[in-house]
Amino acid sequence: MTKLSGSDTKSTLYCSFCGKSQHEVRKLIAGPTVFICDECVELCNDIIREETKAGIAGKKDGGVPTPRDIFETLNDYVIGQDRAKRVLSVAVHNHYKRLKHSGKGGDVELSKSNILLVGPTGSGKTLLAQTLAKTFDVPFTMADATTLTEAGYVGEDVENIILKLLQASDYNVEKAQHGIVYIDEIDKISRKAENPSITRDVSGEGVQQALLKLMEGTTASVPPQGGRKHPQQEFLQVDTTNILFICGGAFAGLEKIIADRLQKRSIGFGAHVADPDKRKVGELLQKAEPEDLLKFGLIPEFVGRLPVIATLNDLDIEALVKILKEPKNALVKQYAKLFELEDVTLTFTDDALEAIAKKAIERKTGARGLRSIVEGLLLDTMFDVPTESDIAEIVVDKDVVEGRKEPVRVLKGKEEAA
């Protein structure tokens, strides 16, 4: 298949689909007597993606995607973490299968299984929850546990979580009742001391107690305009029984609790005891048990409402490089698109991607830190490109990432190293 541009032929060529000329688009791809532009190719890809996404609901079990379907969808956006993706795929499949068959009666009542995601910062907890919501096309909201307090104290009431879910569903109560709620930083509401205190802990144990009812299923009275400023408004009644709650947290220090427990069990003649310091955090977190979460500061009832525990591993250099370039919304693709809008090609060399990944690991920010690193590298270039029309390509290599030089600017017709 041949790519044609304005310099390849004297006559003007047009896209056979949208009718734009070769001068209005970046690329024209030639076929037998027809041409298609890059914009139409992208549009076709979007249509196919939407149909695939819609088709996922038509799979077996009358509309509930299979765990394998969910796993494959998660693979498109989340790199690595296969074990966590499998656990989530099965748990979410069972949850929506339970909803589908809940109205059909029968002797056995299926209980809800909320999910706890445990993993280091920047390992993909939030992204997994967001991708699940997209897969099922259900209302989704995120809440930060650190802002929550018991009702009557300064801070956000737990009912505000359901209000956000209602807003995400355009105040459609029926739709909101089948949504997904992701509560981040759940480890920050652990009990401040291992033994109950006589002083009231309104942002720790108090919030856990307040979340209990929501998570197990209750009818929450939700003020549509927020509770404290409009006391006269009518309340909406939302049944939380069928809302899937996914809680996530880094649980810094949990690995030490697990290591202590494992070491105690390994004591004895001939017992093999691995040095806890030599194990990765993710390896230890995989061995997490409810008793470890209790020791960390979660109350027994709260741990009981989160029967499914999925642990995420630390991301290594190889995984971070894949995250940079492989997912559908990969960071490299996003920045390449930004430069493409200015008719400039952005190129990252393989050693540059490795250097960026190493920097993220040094900063201990995981995948979340990749964007700030790339943004810092390209800031001055993005400032100049819109006003300098003679730039054709920007090349980022290892030396650029390590601060030894500026990104290389390839000019139209000649090359110049900035």
Curated annotation (Swiss-Prot):
Residue positions binding ATP: P120, T121, G122, S123, G124, K125, T126, L127
Binding site for Zn(2+): C15, C18, C37, C40
Annotated SUPFAM superfamilies: Glucocorticoid receptor-like (DNA-binding domain), P-loop containing nucleoside triphosphate hydrolases
One Gene Ontology cellular component: HslUV protease complex
Domain ClpX-type ZB as annotated: residue spans: 3-56
Pfam families: AAA_2 (PF07724), ClpB_D2-small (PF10431), zf-C4_ClpX (PF06689)
Gene3D superfamilies: 1.10.8.60, ClpX chaperone, C4-type zinc finger domain, P-loop containing nucleotide triphosphate hydrolases
UniProt keyword terms in alphabetical order: ATP-binding, Chaperone, Metal-binding, Nucleotide-binding, Zinc
Keyword Zinc: yes
Superkingdom of origin organism: Bacteria
Keyword ATP-binding: yes
GO biological process: cell division; proteolysis involved in protein catabolic process
MF terms (GO), sorted A to Z: ATP binding; ATP hydrolysis activity; ATP-dependent protein folding chaperone; protein dimerization activity; unfolded protein binding; zinc ion binding
Family label: Belongs to the ClpX chaperone family.
Alphabetical list of PANTHER family matching this protein: ATP-DEPENDENT CLP PROTEASE ATP-BINDING SUBUNIT CLPX-LIKE, MITOCHONDRIAL, ATP-DEPENDENT CLP PROTEASE ATP-BINDING SUBUNIT CLPX-LIKE, MITOCHONDRIAL-RELATED
Function, in words: ATP-dependent specificity component of the Clp protease. It directs the protease to specific substrates. Can perform chaperone functions in the absence of ClpP.
Subunit note: Component of the ClpX-ClpP complex. Forms a hexameric ring that, in the presence of ATP, binds to fourteen ClpP subunits assembled into a disk-like structure with a central cavity, resembling the structure of eukaryotic proteasomes.
Protein name: ATP-dependent Clp protease ATP-binding subunit ClpX
Source organism: Novosphingobium aromaticivorans (strain ATCC 700278 / DSM 12444 / CCUG 56034 / CIP 105152 / NBRC 16084 / F199)
Gene it is expressed from: clpX
